[in-house]
Amino acid sequence: MRCPKCQHNKSNVIDSRQAEDGNTIRRRRECDACHARFTTFERVEEVPLLVVKKDGTREQFSRDKIFNGISMSAQKRPVSSEDIENAITRIEKNIRRNHDGEVDSEVIGNLVMKELADLDEITYVRFASVYRSFKDVDEIEELLQEITKTVRAKKESKK
């Protein structure tokens, strides 16, 4: 590691510990030439995720797109930004664990739906109405019946 003071490229690690975020290592170093001390941070470089859209085009995975879609669906609902961020983190971890660099947009949509079903039923229905592009009221009614069964099952299991 190059010293920021004298540009010498040899240094010794004095201290090494995990940073607060848990994904970074903080290292205190001392330059072999001028003995200046400095801090470096090391983290894993994640492979960029590509989303394969329905028309076959590819674009980089965007947490912001998911956040905006969920936020619009969650307007005036008891869903915090933190709840949304946590859901997106779980979605991204799932994708990185189960897919190698590319994932279909449909998979992402289904993961979002799964998270929203657990988070807030109304937000789920709002998101589904856009995501699934319902063709008629019957399709919406089927979704509502499905959600009603799920909610009742959850309430029964809590008793």
Swiss-Prot record:
Residues 49-139 form the ATP-cone domain. Signal peptide: none annotated. Its cofactor is Zn(2+). GO terms for molecular function: ATP binding; DNA binding; zinc ion binding. PROSITE patterns: ATP_CONE. Binds 1 zinc ion. A zinc finger (unnamed) spans 3-34. Keywords: ATP-binding, DNA-binding, Metal-binding, Nucleotide-binding, Repressor, Transcription, Transcription regulation, Zinc, Zinc-finger. Residues 1-21 are annotated as: Disordered. GO terms for biological process: negative regulation of DNA-templated transcription. PANTHER family: TRANSCRIPTIONAL REPRESSOR NRDR. Belongs to the NrdR family. Negatively regulates transcription of bacterial ribonucleotide reductase nrd genes and operons by binding to NrdR-boxes. This is Transcriptional repressor NrdR. The gene is nrdR.
